[in-house]
Amino acid sequence: MVKSKSAYSTPSKIGKLDTHIFVIWVDNEAGVLARVVGLFSGRGYNIESLAVAEVDQKQNLSRVTIVTTGTPQVIEQITLQLKKLVPVHKVANFKRED
């Protein structure tokens, strides 16, 4: 068995992994994407896919879509942490079914 060089625990040792799609509505302003991505990278969560688009110019809102993989506990933690970020208005989490 090869030991991982990662500072973070490897998900395969933690439990069953599921792929989730997060849709996050945020203020369309400088630095918001960095805060959202920083939440993932700072805790060692991998972003498999990322897309950002302005959705409402009048209300100055953008939608960030992130695909990630994690255990149910990790996904719940990500959801709670995203909801605490100041520029975040709404978080939707969808489990991807194969």
Regions found by a protein language model. Name each.
Residues 1-98:
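A conserved regulatory-domain signal marking ACT and ACT-like small-molecule sensing domains
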